[in-house]
């Protein structure tokens, strides 16, 4: 079928994948799903826009409705994974002022205490966002983490809630991506691109 017919089911499938990875279930997104999202981000274009759009809407919705804190927390997990494993364009986008300001706001101001058991879930989101901001602000750390990801690309492990607590130390296999400045130490090349914004608020 023509591209304009094929593109709709592809967009819908990608949206479902990101929604599944950032849902409200008590366990983290599994490694195979994260690896598929990383592969899709490398395709660029519409795939990239769909991934960033759903992540943005999840975070915006959780900011407006803090009881959806798991959606925000798991969106941060996905952003971290794609920073380490996804496209160079995704990294450049997340490092832009637009996205860093959103993540910094989460790291400082996200609040939610469960009224049922008085457990503070806001601190989990703040700490995860703070960790992600530190990663995104460090070019050297990003290059180092992406180098580790390349070396471990043949290993497989599910990304469980325990993995999430350890910042995820095992990665799913994926195909090689085009080299960029973020992978310069491994590949000696330059690349990257810039950035649309997070999707509209829910």
Where are these regions (language model features)?
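Alpha-helical scaffold domains
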Residues: 1-202
């Amino acid at each position: 079928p023509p591209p304009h017919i094929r593109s709709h089911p592809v967009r819908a499938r990608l949206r479902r994948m990101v929604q599944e990875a950032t849902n409200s279930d008590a366990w983290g997104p599994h490694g195979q799903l994260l690896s598929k999202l990383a592969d899709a981000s490398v395709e660029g274009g519409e795939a990239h826009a769909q991934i960033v759009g759903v992540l943005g809407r999840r975070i915006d919705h959780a900011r407006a409705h803090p009881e959806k804190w798991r959606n925000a927390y798991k969106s941060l997990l996905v952003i971290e994974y794609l920073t380490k494993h996804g496209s160079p364009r995704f990294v450049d986008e997340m490092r832009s002022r637009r996205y860093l300001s959103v993540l910094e706001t989460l790291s400082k101001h996200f609040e939610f205490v469960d009224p049922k058991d008085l457990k503070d879930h806001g601190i989990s989101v703040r700490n995860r966002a703070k960790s992600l901001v530190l990663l995104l602000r460090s070019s050297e750390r990003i290059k180092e983490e992406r180098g580790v990801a390349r070396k471990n690309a043949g290993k497989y492990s599910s990304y469980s809630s325990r993995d999430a607590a350890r910042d995820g130390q095992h990665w799913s296999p994926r195909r090689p991506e085009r080299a960029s400045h973020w992978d310069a130490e491994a590949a000696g090349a330059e690349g990257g691109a810039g950035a649309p914004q997070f999707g509209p608020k829910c």
